[in-house]
Design a protein with these regions (language model features):
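Charged, glycine-rich intrinsically disordered N-terminal tails and low-complexity linkers that flank
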Residues: 1-61
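Anion-coordinating catalytic cores for phosphoryl-, nucleotidyl-, and glycosidic chemistry
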Residues: 1-8, 14-15, 114, 118, ...
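Metal-dependent nuclease catalytic regions and adjoining charged, substrate-binding loops involved
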Residues: 9, 165-283
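A residue-level signal for conserved active-site and pocket-lining positions in enzyme catalytic cores
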Residues: 20, 55-56, 126, 185, ...
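Active-site catalytic microenvironments for nucleophilic, acid-base chemistry
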Residues: 32, 61-65, 164-171
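Short, polar/flexible loop-turn hinges at active-site or ligand-entry regions and domain interfaces
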Residues: 35-44, 69-70, 147-150, 171, ...
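A non-catalytic, helix-rich entry segment at domain boundaries
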Residues: 39-110, 114
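Mg2+/Mn2+-dependent nuclease catalytic core
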Residues: 103-105, 109-215
Length: 283
């Protein structure tokens, strides 16, 4: 399958490919805009996504040194105000304690690197690098539920971001190559600020991720259109804009039902689209 000339594999497109080949084909190859609601109620969903986007923007501005008082005065919405308050409580740890003195902070930074005949790209909420070697990846999550570690460790973001940092992040490390053992990825949940999830990287994980990503991309290149089949997990379809096109239903999934179902992780549904929005918006 020929990909668009300007196409780069992001964590969102890779997750699409793993979750549902058909969604990857429609969104990433055909780039089909489909006029469907992602989640009900529409206004509540749109408000929640917008506040998530606003939070990422505010966090970036705070980390580059804009006055906190000015940023705080711009808040609109209860969710955003709560997330922002939690972030401000956490912020001293990013600027003084941990990472602390000597750390360099890179907010909303993009990295890209070739892999075979394709390119990988990642948009990082924050990379913190210390001259003595540690490099931390922070990713802000605004979902109401805290995702389980067992789910996060399977996410393509958890595999791509540390791998890509090792491949392309030497300029963040005074020009020296970053070794996998220097890297740690931290998911910080705005609704659960005292319960971050941390993943320490390793050379073994780096090699496994390179093999996995290479195989995944090579598989895509060999596929014909008929090979981009629908997912067997039709729970994902309720929150996919292409559900009616694929004859997987017309009515959007209910946001309250999703958030109340402890067996369903929010990262597999609505949060996925927000991550893709964020990758584009801050580029």
């Amino acid at each position: 399958m020929n990909l668009p000339d300007d196409f780069q594999f992001s964590q969102g497109s890779l997750q699409d490919l793993v979750d549902c080949r058909r969604r990857f084909f429609l969104r990433c190859i055909r780039r089909l805009a489909w006029p469907a609601v992602q989640s009900e109620p529409v206004i509540e969903h749109e408000r929640y996504v917008q506040q998530g986007s606003d939070f990422h923007r505010l966090a970036q501005q705070a980390l580059v040194g804009l006055p906190i008082e000015r940023l705080s005065a711009s808040l609109v919405g209860e969710d955003l105000a709560r997330w922002w308050g939690n972030f401000l409580d956490y912020l001293p740890g990013l600027t003084r304690a941990e990472p602390g003195p000597g750390w360099q902070l890179y907010a909303e930074i993009s990295l890209t690197a070739p892999l075979g005949d394709a390119r990988l790209v990642g948009k990082y909420d924050l990379v913190a690098a210390h001259p003595q070697g540690r490099v931390l990846i922070y990713d802000w999550k605004t979902t109401r539920q805290r995702s389980r570690r067992s789910v996060l460790e399977k996410r393509l973001q958890t595999r791509l971001y540390p791998y890509l940092l090792v491949r392309a992040g030497a300029f963040l490390n005074a020009g020296a190559p970053i070794q996998p053992e220097q890297v740690e990825m931290i998911y910080w949940f705005a609704e659960h600020p005292q319960q971050p999830e941390r993943f320490v990287y390793s050379s073994a994980a780096y090699q496994a991720d390179e093999a996995f990503l290479t195989s995944l991309i090579e598989t895509v290149m060999r596929l014909d259109e008929a090979d981009f089949y629908l997912t067997d997990d039709d729970r994902l379809c309720a929150y996919c804009v292409y559900r009616s096109l694929c004859n997987r239903g017309v009515t959007a999934g209910d946001l309250a039902t999703l958030e109340g179902d402890r067996d369903e992780d929010p990262l597999t549904t609505i949060d996925l689209d927000f991550e893709q929005i964020a990758e584009i918006e801050y580029s």
